[in-house]
C-alpha cells in the first residue's frame, strides 16, 4: 500500500473521506515551512475491515499559526486506524492539534491509536494538543497520547561529547524526530522530496519544493510530475 502525500496550504477547505469495506489508505499530511495553515479533516471508516494509516508533520517558525483538527470515525466493526502527528515549532509560532477518535456502538473489534508529539524550539513558541476518545463499543483496543517538550538534553550532551557542534547536534535530533513521519512515505521519490524539505527547514532555508507551496490555499497532493 503506497502512502499518499498531501500538502496543507493556508485556509484549506475541510476534507471528508469515506473508507468502504476492506479499503486501506495510507496518508501523510505536510504543513511546509513558511506556511500558516488550518485544516479540518474527517475520515469515516464505514465498511467492515477498513484500515487507515494517517501521519502528519508541521514545521513552523516566526509568527506562523498551524491548526489541525482531525476526526476519525469508526462506524463499522473490525476496522483499524493509526495516527501519528509530529510538529517542530520555533520563534513565536503557535500550533494546535485537536484529534478525536469516535467509535460507534456497532463498531466492535475496533483498533484505533492516536499520538501527537511537538518540539518547542524557543521560549516564545506555543503548542497545545487535545487528543480525545469517544467510545460507545465495549470490545475495542484504543489509545491516545500527546507530548509537548524540548530536545533531549542527554542526547544533545552525548552528541557534543562526540565532537558534534551544538547547532549540528540540534539539527540531527530534530531530523530524527521528524524522520519517523518521513519514513511513512513508501514511494522513494516522494520520501526523498519530503526529507529534503525537512532538512532545508532545519538549516533555516526553504528549498524550491517548499517555496512553491506557500501561496496555495488548498490541500493538494505531491506527485512525481511536479
Annotate each PLM feature.
Residues 1-157, 161-164, 178, 184-211, ...:
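Conserved beta-strand/loop scaffold segments within soluble protein domains that form the structured core
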Amino acid at each position: 500500500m503506497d502512502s499518499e502525500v498531501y500538502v496543507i496550504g493556508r485556509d484549506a477547505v475541510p476534507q471528508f473521506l469515506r473508507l468502504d469495506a476492506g479499503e486501506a489508505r495510507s496518508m501523510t499530511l505536510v504543513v511546509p515551512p513558511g506556511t500558516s495553515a488550518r485544516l479540518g479533516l474527517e475520515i469515516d471508516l464505514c465498511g467492515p475491515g477498513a484500515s487507515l494509516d494517517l501521519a502528519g508533520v508541521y514545521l513552523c517558525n516566526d509568527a506562523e499559526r498551524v491548526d489541525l483538527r482531525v476526526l476519525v470515525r469508526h462506524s463499522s466493526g473490525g476496522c483499524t486506524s493509526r495516527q501519528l502527528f509530529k510538529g517542530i515549532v520555533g520563534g513565536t509560532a503557535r500550533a494546535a492539534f485537536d484529534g478525536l477518535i469516535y467509535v460507534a456502538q456497532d463498531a466492535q473489534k475496533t483498533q484505533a491509536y492516536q499520538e501527537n508529539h511537538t518540539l518547542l524550539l524557543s521560549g516564545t513558541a506555543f503548542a497545545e494538543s487535545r487528543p480525545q476518545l469517544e467510545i460507545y463499543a465495549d470490545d475495542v483496543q484504543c489509545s491516545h497520547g500527546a507530548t509537548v517538550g524540548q530536545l533531549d538534553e542527554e542526547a544533545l550532551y552525548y552528541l557534543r561529547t562526540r565532537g558534534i557542534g551544538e547547532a549540528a547536534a540540534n539539527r540531527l535530533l530534530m531530523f530524527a524526530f521528524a524522520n519517523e513521519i518521513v519514513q511513512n512515505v513508501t514511494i522513494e521519490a516522494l520520501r526523498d522530496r519530503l526529507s529534503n524539505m525537512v532538512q532545508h527547514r532545519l538549516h533555516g532555508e526553504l528549498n524550491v519544493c517548499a517555496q512553491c507551496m506557500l501561496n496555495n490555499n488548498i490541500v493538494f497532493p505531491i506527485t512525481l510530475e511536479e
